[in-house]
């Protein structure tokens, strides 16, 4: 049968011996099947692999057809922000807690992956957000997020006063502990815990979810995915930052705005053929069971 993928990258940042075991098992299995395999440098070092081709995440993105992320959702988010810049498919083997983005069961991963490698899979394009912290005539600080961009105090929790502009038109002002700007992918993450809506992954939409607002009128807002969001801050506000996927933080200085828009590139996320988004909601998040 024709191979749909020729070069496969193995990525992830293992924290437990069981995850490292999965990395090594996957490497040996792929090599035995005749695939060209690129192993992320840190993994190869920790496994003490010899005669193995290694690369950085960027090199894997440039050279491989498929990246297999071994770990939890945090590993997937960290790797996917880089891999999304390249024309590469990404799938995950769950070695974390929730595993909402890592579909493959570690106990049955090789059989599931064998089906995927033969072309039996579901492909999705997930968009990212780009966040810019900028001041007029100053250099921008930029990062991206798969799940969400969060405005919050830097160290000590306190109320923030800010205004929100959508496509440069004033939308609303708010006094709250922060704001979560989420993709459909991130709607089942931090946004959900703050009362935000669940968006199916194919929706072209962005959600704005207030964090502990100091008014009864503040509610989550869903806007078009093509929109550009600008956050402006009261001069009384200080020690603020935005975080991307709870992994990258950008401090906000006095006089700076934050711009958030959809990224120019997307993540090519693939799933096993029997994948169901609503089944994942049920099994991972306790979504309502069938009555009959």
UniProtKB/Swiss-Prot annotation:
Principal localisation: cytoplasm
Superkingdom of origin: Bacteria
The protein's Enzyme Commission number: 2.7.1.23
Keyword Acetylation: no
One GO BP annotation of this record: NAD metabolic process
Keyword Metal-binding tagged: no
MF (Gene Ontology): ATP binding; metal ion binding; NAD binding; NAD+ kinase activity
Record Pfam families: NAD_kinase (PF01513), NAD_kinase_C (PF20143)
GO cellular component terms, semicolon-separated: cytoplasm
Protein location: Cytoplasm
Annotated keywords: ATP-binding, Cytoplasm, Kinase, NAD, NADP, Nucleotide-binding, Transferase
Active site per UniProt: 73 (proton acceptor)
Residues annotated for NAD(+) binding in this entry: 73-74, 147-148, 158, 175, 177, 188-193, 247
Catalytic reaction annotation: NAD(+) + ATP = ADP + NADP(+) + H(+)
Cofactor(s) it depends on: a divalent metal cation
Similarity section: Belongs to the NAD kinase family.
Xref: NCBIfam families: PRK01231.1 (NF002306), PRK03378.1 (NF002893)
Cited function: Involved in the regulation of the intracellular balance of NAD and NADP, and is a key enzyme in the biosynthesis of NADP. Catalyzes specifically the phosphorylation on 2'-hydroxyl of the adenosine moiety of NAD to yield NADP.
Protein's recorded name: NAD kinase
Source organism per UniProt: Klebsiella pneumoniae subsp. pneumoniae (strain ATCC 700721 / MGH 78578)
